Amino acid sequence: MAKKYVYLFKEGNANMRELLGGKGANLAEMTNLGMPVPQGFTVTTEACTRYYTDGKVIGDDIVEQIYAALAETEKVAGKKFGDDKDPFLVSVRSGARASMPGMMDTILNLGLTDVSVVGLANLTNNPHFAYDAYRRFIAMFSDVVMEIPKNEFEAVLDEFKEKKGVKYDRDLSADDLKEVVVRFKEIYKKHMGVDFPQDPKVQLMEAVKAVFRSWDNPRAIYYRRMNDIPGDWGTAVNVQSMVFGNMGETSGTGVAFTRNPSTGEKKLYGEYLLNAQGEDVVAGIRTPEPISHLQEQMPDVYQQFVDIATKLEAHYRDMQDMEYTIERGKLYMLQTRNGKRTAAAALKIAVDLVDEGVLSEEEAVLKVEPKQLDTLLHPNFDAAAVKKAPVIAKGLPASPGAATGGIYFTADEAAEHGKNKEKVILVRRETTPEDIEGMDFSQGILTVFGGMTSHAAVVARGMGRAAVVGCGALKIDEEAKTLTVGDKVYHEGDFISLDGSTGNVYDGQIATVEASISGEFARFMGGADAARRLRVRTNADTPRDTKQAVKFGAEGIGLCRTEHMFFEADRIAAVREMILADTKEQREKALAKILPMQQGDFEAMYKALEGKPMTVRYLDPPLHEFVPHVDMKEEIDELAKNLGITSEEVIHKINALHESNPMMGHRGCRLAVTYPEIAEMQTRAVLQAAIDVTRECGYNIVPEIMIPLVGSKKELAFVKSIVDETAKKVFEEQGMTLEYHVGTMIEIPRAAVTADEIAEEAEFFSFGTNDLTQMTFGFSRDDAGKFLGAYYDNKIFESDPFARLDTDGVGKLVQMAAKLGRQTRPNLKLGICGEHGGDPSSVMFCHKVGLNYVSCSPFRVPIARLAAAHAAILEKMGK
């Protein structure tokens, strides 16, 4: 039996989403429920996949099935396609299995020709309606199917309205519209070299192909990447009998939700327009009326709609987004789907549906997407204000939140103005660790270069600052202190605004509203926590970040980067002395200055954690990052004075630190191998801090010491011996011992494939997936943004491997290391501390491979908690 590629609505059901797409499955389900659905058929997602496999051709067997389904639908309608007296017209719409509103294409009124439009005008005794439908169809078909610029058609309409002195398209007469149709067909012939097609079957097949093609249009590709929708799913095509909302004042069209999608309030929410077609509502040319007014204008239709809406929500057990048309007083349902909603509404609806007895706690947890929580935790722009603000540029949405401030081009300037309580946006080509203070005092960060895991992105997320990175449209002149975007020049102190959730950069100031976490949030997250197995820690380097993360539900620190503490203004001089020292004695003298500062940092962190665990990563970055640039004369002179050498000698030493490839150079555990005294100082700081806080507060602290960038067992054994020897001395001096653990970051591919050997020394593994991704692909994460766009365009990649874990490659190394490590040490604790720890799909993977915890930026902690709950619930359900 031939494979079935086309299903009539009556042949499908809601469980066939993968085959029929969301729209097709729901149209089938509404048909089965006996609702007034204009009939039609769905061409499956498998037909779309085959269309691409066959070289963008629809196979003859699929064409035959489409024509057979068309004949069945004609019988139901009692009309014929292309008939000159009573023509059968259809809409052609996309429908992927995941909702992608507005991303793909729609064509209405298909089947109209020069002959059938006359029949439609005579049949309805309404030539205005018939020619209005025809001009809409020609414009849509030309735009969507043939890619003729739609502004050419809009210009003709504007010309006619101006000539006739009217405001709206509907105010043009039937004779005007006949002339518009002639002009539209002329535009089509000018572009295509042939007349507008007059065979409805040709129109239909071209439209189906266009919907398949639209699966790969730029906005659909971007939307898929943003929402983790696989590119090989394809879209279905729904061919549906047309019903008309533009047949006079007893006709109309609208969109409604069973609950308020902004607040979650249990109240019908929606709009409609009389004498209009669907796109009129969306286009916003006319102001729609609230659906409550329909009760006055058409009480019977309104009551029927309320009954259907109630039935649909009860059936789908979720808030529904419905499209409907009223044709001459008769209601038709064109679509239902689970409605898109704000994060606040999602929480309220989930909690309310549990209270109403509709959902279990676990089912409710699955109703909220983890990424949605982002917007709850950061300040947001006022919705009305942001609509009016001009967008001047767009970059990568690296760290969510809304920020408005004056622009400054150096971290020092940003910090200076920030300390004066001014609102600041730090604008840089790219940020470096030295910019940390300026970033801290900024509301937002904007960079020309860098990707989603660049320094600016990672640090901004950790701080909860809005950040837009990789905004290539910007031109920065640091000397003149100007930012040029297009032909507009901004000077230091001029105001711009950033939306870190969308990547938009706006001109001027936009009012913001603080994020408010509702009681529903705490209750909902309690249900999520009860369901998950995976623990969630945070990446934090300051007590403030730690407290914020604990407030968001972090169960400890999975990554405390000690180098961030070294950049503080009061200690960078001592750090530089240590780096540029010639002898061990000089180095130890400088380290003695740093020790009390580092110990004080750890004490503050342990107190903020209140007994929760903390993994401290020893010094990791290349040393050149800590020293001043050779052209920073004041800093060089001061350093020379402190070291008792000349400025020229300091410059010589700085130049000697230069490396061709610093990310694979003298960093990580290699620093401890060459300078053991650094590891000694850090061990003292960690253990003495733990002892002091244990004595003072009574917490049961078990320090976790993590050695970075280990590639072999011997490397780890060498550094671990320094830790153990120093620990012995500290315990003797303090007259007290503590349990502590030494582990390593798995971030070099060799460490992953020899994990069984490394586990002989390591008591825990933490996967540093930022570096592991970088080294596995051979990509520099700070430069990958220059070519990843081409990889997306050419379908080599569907998502950024630095933002979403590459489970096929990097993930296999994680899986291998986990398995090998536990063969050696069955109780080996496993975590992940790269930025992937806050990505929902990556958290899902971590659950599957049996990790103990994920660690992420403080503002991503709730997202990881919810993603971990999703993973556990879906596993339980066998999905």
Label each region the model flagged.
Residues 238, 408, 425-427, 446, ...:
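Structural motif
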Residues 330-332, 432-440, 444-446, 452-458, ...:
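Glycine-rich phosphate/ribose-binding loops and adjacent secondary-structure elements
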Residues 394-434, 485-523:
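Extended, non-globular alpha-helical segments
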Residues 41, 448-450, 469-472, 560, ...:
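Short beta->alpha connector loops at strand-helix junctions that form conserved
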Residues 1-389, 415-418, 422-425, 432-434, ...:
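Nucleotide/phosphate-binding sheet-loop regions of phosphoryl- and nucleotidyl-transfer enzymes
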Residues 208, 215, 377-405, 409, ...:
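Flexible inter-domain linker/hinge segments
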Residues 93-94, 517-519, 527-879:
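Conserved alpha/beta-domain cores
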